[in-house]
Amino acid sequence: MDMKIAIPLFGSRISPRFDFSPELWIITVENGDVIHQKKLSIAHLNLLQRLEQLTSNEVKHVICGGIDGFCLSQLGSKGISVLHNIAGEAEVIFNLFLKDLKL
């Protein structure tokens, strides 16, 4: 079964704030392997539209920097888990997350 993970980006790094991220990286993983990935421009979207992007793309996990309580609550109510207060190069953090999934 596949799983989608989203990482808000600022350049190649995890965006310091979910609500100000200009880009969203969505990665589809199946049996521990990446089978698809895409990057969406979200700079023009308001907060509710950003949340809708996650649900409409069937994201199950979000890895992000700072995120406000409203967004955490909204995502949690939709069954999306959030790993927050994470900083660093997005690809490095994603690979660590993926490695943990394979254990």
Model-identified regions with their sequence ranges:
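Conserved functional loop/turn residues at catalytic and ligand-binding sites
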Residues: 58, 66, 79
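C-terminal structural segments of small proteins and small subunits
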Residues: 69-103
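N-terminal basic/disordered segments at the start of proteins
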Residues: 1-22, 26-27
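Compact, glycine-rich, soluble single-domain proteins
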Residues: 37-56
